[in-house]
């Protein structure tokens, strides 16, 4: 009877302990999900609820090769955006094509209590140079020299003697199909990509970006030597934006660890008490 009662109480204590562990695990998961959901809701309210009140957008584009530039700025607040672009000409003695594009966009959303500022700038420059020189020389020299010596006869009354001497000297010199071909080809291309993304709160945003926008190349040949001269000049673009913002801190001090410790301790005490009671019986 005592053995049966002890086994029954031990089974009950084991079931209670397993239920307590599962309950504490579920509470910890719920607490973590609640914290994640609270942060996502707050971020959505900041970006969606207050983002449509104020907006500032600027798009800048320029093309150096065609010599054309266009810019459009739309304003709906007191924000100010100043842009200075300096472009220098590109010269190449053989053939060169240079294209560069600069784009900048700034969006500002603000309210009475919370402000979110996001700035994205990207610059891409592509320079390509291709030079092909070919020289072909063909020299053909042909020389033929020949010397022929034929018959000599000597005769007397008593005895006839005939001597024949044949001598042929042939000198032939042939130079043909002497070809000298020189192919000089040079191709160089460079791609410079600079992109930066930043999020700033209650801090004036000042970004200076320097983009190499012009490249000149000269090629000179003297005798049998070749020389390349590369000259790079930089064009400077300044983009500045100022904004005022307020900041508020939200903290949640209750964590999932507190739930696990609190409920785990309570169920552990209950299990120990059940085991001690079974032993006393």
UniProtKB/Swiss-Prot annotation:
**Reported induction:** Up-regulated upon milbemycins A3 oxim derivative (A3Ox) treatment.
Per the UniProt entry, the propeptide covers 257-281
Q: Where in the cell is it found?
A: Cell membrane
Which residues span the membrane? none
What keyword terms does UniProt attach to this protein? Cell membrane, Glycoprotein, GPI-anchor, Lipoprotein, Membrane, Signal
- Covalently lipidated residues (GPI-anchor amidated serine) read 256
Topology within the bilayer: Lipid-anchor; GPI-anchor
Residues annotated as region Disordered?
52-94, 106-227
Glycan attachment sites = 150, 239, 246, 249, 252
Q: Which GO terms describe its cellular component?
A: plasma membrane; side of membrane
Q: What is this protein called?
A: Predicted GPI-anchored protein 39
Q: Which gene encodes it?
A: PGA39
